[in-house]
From Swiss-Prot:
The lineage of its organism: Bacteria, Pseudomonadati, Pseudomonadota, Betaproteobacteria, Burkholderiales. One of its GO terms (biological process) is DNA-templated transcription. DNA-dependent RNA polymerase catalyzes the transcription of DNA into RNA using the four ribonucleoside triphosphates as substrates. GO terms for cellular component: DNA-directed RNA polymerase complex. The RNAP catalytic core consists of 2 alpha, 1 beta, 1 beta' and 1 omega subunit. When a sigma factor is associated with the core the holoenzyme is formed, which can initiate transcription. This is DNA-directed RNA polymerase subunit beta. Its EC number is 2.7.7.6. Coiled coil: none annotated. Pfam families: RNA_pol_Rpb2_1, RNA_pol_Rpb2_2, RNA_pol_Rpb2_3, RNA_pol_Rpb2_45, RNA_pol_Rpb2_6, RNA_pol_Rpb2_7. It comes from Paraburkholderia phytofirmans (strain DSM 17436 / LMG 22146 / PsJN). The keyword Nucleotidyltransferase applies.
Amino acid sequence: MQYSFTEKKRIRKSFAKRPIVHQVPFLLATQLESFSTFLQADTSSTQRKPEGLQAAFTSVFPIVSHNGFARLEFVSYMLSPPAFNIKECQQRGLTYCSALRAKVRLVLLDKESPSKPVVKEVKEQEVYMGEIPLMTPTGSFVINGTERVIVSQLHRSPGVFFEHDKGKTHSSGKLLFSARIIPYRGSWLDFEFDPKDVLYFRVDRRRKMPVTILLKAIGLTPEQILANFFVFDNFTLMPEGAQMEFVPERLRGEVARFDITDRDGNVIVQKDKRINAKHIRDLDNAKTKFISVPEDYLLGRVLAKNVVDGDTGEVIANANDEITETVLEKLRESKIKDIQTLYTNDLDQGPYISSTLRIDETADKMAARIAIYRMMRPGEPPTEEAVEALFNRLFYSEDAYDLSKVGRMKFNRRVGRDEIVGPMTLQDDDILATIKILVELRNGKGEVDDIDHLGNRRVRCVGELAENQFRAGLVRVERAVKERLGQAESENLMPHDLINSKPISSAIREFFGSSQLSQFMDQTNPLSEITHKRRVSALGPGGLTRERAGFEVRDVHPTHYGRVCPIETPEGPNIGLINSLALYAHLNEYGFLETPYRKVVDSKVTDQIDYLSAIEEGRYVIAQANAAVAEDGSLTDELVSSREAGETLMVTPDRIQYMDVAPSQIVSVAASLIPFLEHDDANRALMGSNMQRQAVPCLRPEKAVVGTGIERTVAVDSGTTVQAFRGGVVDYVDAGRMVIRVNDDEAAAGETGVDIYNLIKYTRSNQNTNINQRPIVKVGDIVSRGDVLADGASTDLGELALGQNMLVAFMPWNGYNFEDSILISEKVVADDRYTSIHIEELNVVARDTKLGPEEITRDISNLAEVQLGRLDESGIVYIGAEVEAGDVLVGKVTPKGETQLTPEEKLLRAIFGEKASDVKDTSLRVPSGMSGTVIDVQVFTREGIQRDKRAQQIIDDELKRYRLDLNDQLRIVEGDAFQRLARMLDGKVANGGPKKLAKGTKIEQAYLQDLDHYHWFDIRLADEEAAAQLEAIKDSIEQKRHQFDLAFEEKRKKLTQGDELPPGVLKMVKVYLAVKRRLQPGDKMAGRHGNKGVVSKIVPIEDMPYMADGRPADVVLNPLGVPSRMNVGQVLEVHLGWAAKGLGWRIGEMLQRQAKIAELREFLTKIYNESGRAEELDSFTDDEIVELAKNLREGVPFATPVFDGATEEEMSRALDLAFPDDIAKNLGMTPSKNQVRLYDGRTGEMFERTVTVGYMHYLKLHHLVDDKMHARSTGPYSLVTQQPLGGKAQFGGQRFGEMEVWALEAYGASYVLQEMLTVKSDDVTGRTKVYENLVKGDHVIDAGMPESFNVLVKEIRSLGIDIDLDRN
């Protein structure tokens, strides 16, 4: 096995029993692939597939004018590079996007041309079509400076669906069948039976009409309709009775209404006997062709065709008429011999279409279409053209109706056709086929569809959602262009005069900015980012709504297996509607979810991997990943547990066709991070996977000692870490930048082989957590492509590290862990284990008001010197200042209107001048409850406004930093190029050169070192190829210099141009505060198994329970939290974590006593290779073994993959290896080594029972008490009720509700109650009086009338009751 540079530093010991047969795919692939398909930016315009933007353009263009003499054709489109990079967009609050330009061609035809159209003029031009937001390399979008994610939508696939109402509609419980044809866009067509078995149709859920109206409208006559749905019985009328053609299976099961005889007159079936199989056989044997029937047998039957008198041409009876005695008489009079009737019975041939035809009053095709027109457009007079146009537009027009590729495929498959391609509009035979299947369902043949089957639900990804929006915008443009095309020739217009890009821009902007599926990215930690991008929602436009979604839609379905995670979904109203993709799931070309399986041939597992969708999967027998497999790949068990069509069964190996690729295949990323998931109850696992997403990144991330082996994949795929683009040697490292000198074989010829990585330092995430990258390589390290070079937030040596490993003891402690409370040692806080940094962004804007512009300044009256001391001369706080709540960050004054002055004020003005009173202080202050350090300030100034000193200084600093960066890059690039040159020139023969280099001399290193580097290029070489190479390197350096100069100029231009600010804003200042949050009582914490709680007390280290060797516990948890919750995984994690730490301590002890490398190797081999997946430690050098051992001192990380984890024996073996008997005795461990004797820290006495102790990875969640604690003295009041507002955001008060009032009443505290309900709430006059009294030093309350009483009076008056307050 190949280990990467980072993996070698710390190997995770895996207990997996199965080899890796299929790597976990790139976790963000769905988003990135979908959007790149939408843009097709890197494909040349001629080779673009009809997908995404290309499809939208080609579906709307060409646009033809109303008179047909002008048309606008689409040629191609191109995307220009974005004006600002991602970081600049985030800083300036811009959208990271690219301008879309389309090349269109205006073709004008000659109106005078008599016969065929002749092209008179062609104008081609590039037209601006708006801006398209671009996806960042990590799958998000930057919209107005914030990162957003477009969530994929799970919606009903287009196609045809058959269902019944489960007997809920009608009181009798009768099943009413219905069918629905759903197009991708266009009108829905529904067919439904009513309780009387009449078949109706409706368009777009409007009024229902008999289905035969639709059949007539598509051109069928009643005869054709009946011929399509029924088989006919043939009768020949005889002078006495009639003869019926004998069809055996039609008679079976019926009761004979007369004696049935054979040709010789022998009675085979007696009257009133049921006809059975033997009777049919006898009739067959007698070679019966016809049966004589009495005349009354015909009565009540229905004619299948119109009956016409052969002589006169008169219609005697119509198709679908019932045969009565009158009709029979007429038939005999007209000498009609042969008639056909419909064959129906009560079991499997109902008369439904015939009954429907009977209630249908329309006569012919036109009448039927008029009826449909009246239903669609009630009140409008139907003209023939309008009627035809509406009907054709409903289902037959490509503009208005699109079944889509998926819809056509699903439709054809459902109606049993072989080919899966066809027209995208509805055809007549499609409607007929649908009705036929529906009638067959009513007749008891076939099955209804399961709507929740993942073969009937498909995923719309970013690309598709964006394409739909773009098309909607284009269609709006098309309408406008059609209007103007008529004038194109007369006014000599160009294409850009015709096209207005506003509708497209607004459609795209609305979608990315405010659509339900465009969400503010959850950026708490790398896992929450990745999960958000892999989320699949059933809500959103065109999807379900929370209120209407029933239990079935939300429930886990057998087809979710390997496609959608059965565990991870939110608790609350969205449960089951928002899901997560499973680990290996993947979208196919139609948008259906697929999952990989290994092919099994003749009971042998092969290496072939096939992706199957839910529809295909139903046809195979699939074994689970944990089926026993021999060395040669054959299945060894006699019976293998497998799945077929959603059912679990035990089958013999020869029936198995596929096998799962991995046990973790069925769960999502978050669930696959929970060790021992198989031992947790599903409800708790759900909480565990949701809470991992809320873990706040700690100051020093620490890897989980017990993991599942997928941590590295998550960290790398999330994009939080920095990966090497190309391999090479680390040349330079500091906290903010790394430089790698690329390997010769990876650097393209003539190119400078240097990669420079600038790290993200202390940046604010969407959730105000801190994003910071730290290098994990040192100068001289050799790295290869894809290696992790720097850790990001919540990653440790390239692995996800959401929390900290805590020494946990399960025991009660003085009631402080009652009801899931958590007891924490002071040492945890002192060591900053759970300290996190949060970055708050505070904004202030200076606007242009009616009374004059607001000003950002240091010159503010009534401000203490302490406050002013933090501001620079521009009135903006210094970086590095430590600020508390209420401190001024940016000084700002606003002009205020002239007010009526009191005599005292006039006097003051006369003495002290005007300035102070005509402005009011509106400075930006630190909000209540917040304190921290200023880490960054940004000043944005509108174009044309003079920049202040601070803004100019920020620009200068930025340019200086950029110039240094470029100089460093150039130095490294040149150094690298000259190193390569020295290697190349060494020993080459020269034709001459500087310092009188003679022709034919061999160049030596000493000569080169004496020479100035730039003179090396003056050496003339004999070898032409080498000379060309020398020239190429010289050109490349010159080019790089030129490139850097251009880049610097570009940067300067960007920084010095004015900023785009909202209208009316002159200046904007953003101040970033870093807030340090230590762990404190009230913070929420959790493990990974749904074991959550709130910190109740932080206990001094000397009071914590401790072991025999004096080691105190970090966390004390309540043991009662485990049995009822059934999340036993946490207990197993604690045991394995204990073993992991113990092994680390033993390795640390070996390193301390400088044990021999051989001993170290032997011990590591025992750890890694005695069970589970073996590691190739022999391939490591001694230095690498020592480095590995050093990184293992704090615990050997274990991986216990989901559903394939460590067994009890393996855990016991690990514990025995970690704690030999002598060590175990010193620690006071029990003989089984899974519990420890603990001592009470306060009394020093041993606790009565042994306690389960070990290491658990514990997280601090983003529900911090600092963000929730809030107090108010005075603040804003509600406008109508005059009561204080509620909530921290409004700086509101505490609600004194109904039950609190009861409590005070119960105590008889009448004065307190009066105070609460009046002056502390909504008694306006009373409030001011209290203030006046306090100023006077008189602590008296004058309670008056609460404002809510007046509100009540007004409310009653608004109901028309005259009520007035008697104030006497």
